[in-house]
Swiss-Prot record:
The active site is at C146 (acyl-thioester intermediate), H239 (proton acceptor), E241. It comes from the Bacteria. The record marks N113, L147 as: Important for acyl-CoA specificity. Signal peptide: none annotated. It is found in: Cytoplasm. This is Homoserine O-succinyltransferase. The gene is metAS. GO terms for molecular function: homoserine O-acetyltransferase activity; homoserine O-succinyltransferase activity. Keywords: Acyltransferase, Amino-acid biosynthesis, Cytoplasm, Methionine biosynthesis, Transferase. Substrate binds at K167, S196, R253. GO terms for biological process: methionine biosynthetic process.
Length: 355
């Protein structure tokens, strides 16, 4: 929670300059604690639908312990669904019409699987742009994850993402490059984040559009950037929401694709994710799997218990800190009426007073 500058002590101004939340007495007096309403547009495929709910709910729930958060999951048309996922959505999700009617303070937009060479050719593109159009006028801040970042960037600025020609896959070291921005204030200046993508928006493309890059990796590129107003849209290219085992599940899925003949090459390891001990065990497993494939035998059992004992999570605490900063800023500037994005005195084009 922010400090209140109830005296002229110079330390308050010094902390403001360092990016610390410090409210004036007048602004603090206008803050009535109420619950916050956060939407989750979940576009992930059936197998990851509920895991994605847990991942983002966990990050929101791990934020400020004083404020209560109401989560509002919903989805859109144009995404293929099996019977079980469709039933889950029908039972537990809200409609976009209801979301629009009742309003949100913040909106998280997940990634999605794609089947077309260009995002605008996807069946979900038009429904997704309708959500974007509404949210940009009615929600205090939108937080986009990976594919959603690429989609909103293209929709807003007309610039398509670039295919890398390979999969950026693993856990990469990142550095905060704008330490005074409130989103990254008081977090670790170096930290890891998982990436899992074939496409990228490069720093030069973001800066040409007026975005401000806050966190990047020498090896993996930009992770975190913000819209020109510095808060209305938060762009993630990586996956800070990932569980410790998320990349392991992806790796196992690729192994099964290789064994079934869906891919020709044996999958490489996610970079900087497995320890040397795990790598050695998985190399042995890979040899056994190849032998079984050549001989037409069933695949050997995966050494999951051993692998799980040696996996580390080097990103969760920083992810929680960033989400806490994001939600805290929303709370300070959103209107008491959740259908209105800002308090009356807040400039929508410069909501943090920093642009």
């Amino acid at each position: 929670m922010p400090l209140v500058a109830h005296t002229d002590l110079p330390t308050f101004q010094r902390l403001r300059e360092e990016g610390q939340d410090v409210l004036s007495v007048e602004r603090a007096a206008r803050q009535d604690i109420r619950e916050m309403h956060i939407g989750l547009l979940n576009m992930m495929p059936d197998a990851a639908l509920e895991a994605t709910e847990r991942q983002f709910f966990r990050l929101v729930g791990g934020a400020n312990p004083i404020v209560q958060f109401h989560m509002h999951p919903f989805t859109i048309e144009g995404l293929p669904r099996g019977d079980q996922a469709a039933e889950h959505i029908a039972r537990y999700y809200e409609s976009f019409d209801r979301i629009r009617e009742e309003g949100l303070d913040g909106l998280i937009v997940s990634g999605a699987n794609v089947t077309q060479p260009h995002l605008q050719q996807e069946a979900f593109w038009q429904p997704l742009t309708e959500v974007f159009d509404w949210a940009r006028s009615n929600v205090t801040s939108i937080l986009c994850s990976c594919l959603a970042t690429h989609a909103l960037f293209q929709y807003s600025y007309g610039v398509e993402r670039t295919h890398l020609g390979f999969k950026r896959w693993g856990v990469y070291s990142h550095r905060v490059v704008e330490p005074l921005h409130p989103l990254v204030a008081d977090i670790n200046t170096r930290f890891d984040v998982p990436h899992s993508r074939y496409n990228e928006i490069f720093r030069e493309d973001m800066e040409a559009a007026g975005l401000r890059v806050l966190v990047e990796s020498e090896e993996a590129g930009v992770h975190l950037a913000v819209s020109p107003d510095l808060f209305r849209v938060i762009y993630f290219q990586a996956h800070p929401e990932y569980d410790t085992v998320s990349l392991l599940k992806e790796y196992k899925r690729e192994i099964l694709r290789y064994f079934s003949g869906e891919r020709e090459d044996y999958p490489p390891f996610p970079e900087h994710y497995f320890s040397l001990e795990v790598g050695a065990a998985l190399n042995d497993y890979g040899q056994a799997l190849r032998s079984a494939r050549r001989a037409g035998r069933a695949p050997p059992p995966f050494p999951e218990e051993f692998v799980l004992r040696h996996l580390d999570n080097t990103w969760r605490d920083t992810a929680k800190a960033v989400f806490n900063n994001w939600l805290g800023k929303i709370y300070q500037i959103t209107d008491q009426d959740r259908r209105k994005p800002f308090m009356a005195h807040i400039d929508p084009d410069n909501p943090l007073g920093l642009a």
